[in-house]
Amino acid sequence: MIASCLYYLLLPAARLFRFLSDAFFTCRKNALLAKSSSPQVEGNFAMAPRGPDQEECEGLLQQWREEGWNQTPSTASEGPLADKGLAESSLALLMDNSGEQDAASEDKWSSRQLSDLRAAENLNQPFPEVLGEEPLAEVEGPLWAAVPVQTGPQYADCAVLPMGAMAAEQWEEDPAMVAWSIAPEPMPQEETSMWPFEGLEQLQPPPMEIPYHEILWREWEDFSTQPDAQGLEAGDGPQFQFTLMSYNILAQDLMQQSSELYLHCHPDILNWNYRFANLMQEFQHWDPDILCLQEVQEDHYWEQLEPSLRMMGFTCFYKRRTGCKTDGCAVCYKPTRFRLLCASPVEYFRPGLELLNRDNVGLVLLLQPLVPEGLGQVSVAPLCVANTHVLYNPRRGDVKLAQMAILLAEVDKVARLSDGSHCPIILCGDLNSVPDSPLYNFIRDGELQYNGMPAWKVSGQEDFSHQLYQRKLQAPLWPSSLGITDCCQYVTSCHPKRSERLKYGRDFLLRFRFCDLACQRPVGLVLMEGVTDTKPDRPAGWAECIFEEEISELEPVFPRTIGTIQHCLHLTSVYTHFLPQHGCPEVTTMPLGLGMTVDYIFFSAESCENENRTDHRLDRDGTLKLLGRLSLLSEEILWAANGLPNPFYSSDHLCLLASFGMEVTAP
């Protein structure tokens, strides 16, 4: 209780004592400041020269009291120096200093000095213009706080500027400080482009100063005047010329499902509307006669791609992937150049077969070229065009080989002519295999020994998962129930055609001469002596019955080779997969920043003897001749344009474009 009383009594007394002591020391400090022998202050606060006449100073002080004392405001908000008694004591101490002062400047100096003392005391800072005095500690607080301007009636021409305000004016006017000023914070925008994928941060727009047209320029390589592999010059006869493009256009759904592959891209260039406009410009620029597309999203195809391509003069066929997949393959052709003979969609999914449980598809079209009327009575062989997108998984090379075998069997059936030969063939698409891989060599060379080969090696794609588990290919690669031989042909295509009437030879019928059924007397047979009354004697060693398997017509048997698959389509690649002018490989895509070739255009060519080389088959132009191609780019060039996709190419693949010529023969 006593402690509480002492607390409430002594605390106010201590505060009062502290207030009085602070006021006293403040006045004393100001008096010493005025008496300081420092150099004169320049500017508006310059002091008049001091003289020895102290009586004149007292007279001036008395005059100031009579004229301005009654008009000086006294408010509690101005601090201790605003008190009338403290101001009077401060002025008295200031006048104790002997010196002669000018009467005209005394009044002006006194009023401004008092205002500056008040401002300095309020901020607890030393007078900034007096030299030789040690600065006091700065008060913690915001430097740029707004302080109202204080003025008095008799000091209307001199406002009290706080120290922070003066510093602010100096900051704005000093060009040296402005040069080092911090950049202003960006203002919030109403619309900000955001990533279309969750969990990704916003990136700055791509630098538009990149010359995409110059970096990504692709040359057209003309082979129309070059000799073929045997050194034979190109023929001068008429040709049916056409161009074909193969393009994986990157389905939007697949891009969003694998968003981590496109972190290097600005979100604006990944927008489908932007990509669709770019793709259509590419189609219009190159204007191919046949267009083979992969990763075509179904809703985009029916709503945008098919109507737009139809307006460009194309007739399109589309095959969506099986299952719940939303993309597929499309083949488009110009009806002014070709007439459709047949279209065959190919599904690689086979229920019950673990090897073929994937949803990839393909399309095979048989087209008849339309010869211009000016060439007269001439004919051109049909053209078989196959388009596919093979499984990506690098670890399942067995699945890729089985899918390719199904496609080749379908091509063999569609392209086979009545004499057993094949019409010209073009096979293109995204095969998800690199050049010189076993799958690539199988398509080009027509043969592959796969028994014991690790599955991850088939496509040649970089993948280290095989180190944990190696799946090796075993013969036979696919079961006989698939109906495809090891020569990649349908079993039904290899059967000789049967007629409805059965034909039996004499030797075959004589085998039934002494069988049990032949030796029995038919019921109701009229008995005639010497004719129907005798029973034939069966010779020794003659079988009493004929087994069913002996009389049934045997199905043709196709022996399966041990660990080897073949095909007889004689395909070769349009591209060489190497850029001699750059000394580096060609690139059609850049997954995870690694450039590689996985897209191809194969076409049928005639094989010829290779006396100097035994590793690769040497081909020459046949009915189908390669006239030109659009060059590919290197990995270094694509990285200079920030990879794929970019503002110039709106897919993660480059398009492939080739020009062909077909022989025109007289009927």
Curated annotation (Swiss-Prot):
The modification Phosphoserine is found at S77, S105. GO terms for molecular function: catalytic activity; eukaryotic initiation factor 4E binding; protein domain specific binding. It holds the Pfam family Exo_endo_phos. SUPFAM superfamilies: DNase I-like. InterPro entries: CCR4/nocturin_mRNA_transcr, Endo/exonu/phosph_ase_sf, Endo/exonuclease/phosphatase. Keywords: Phosphoprotein. This is Protein angel homolog 1. The lineage of its organism: Eukaryota, Metazoa, Chordata, Craniata, Vertebrata.
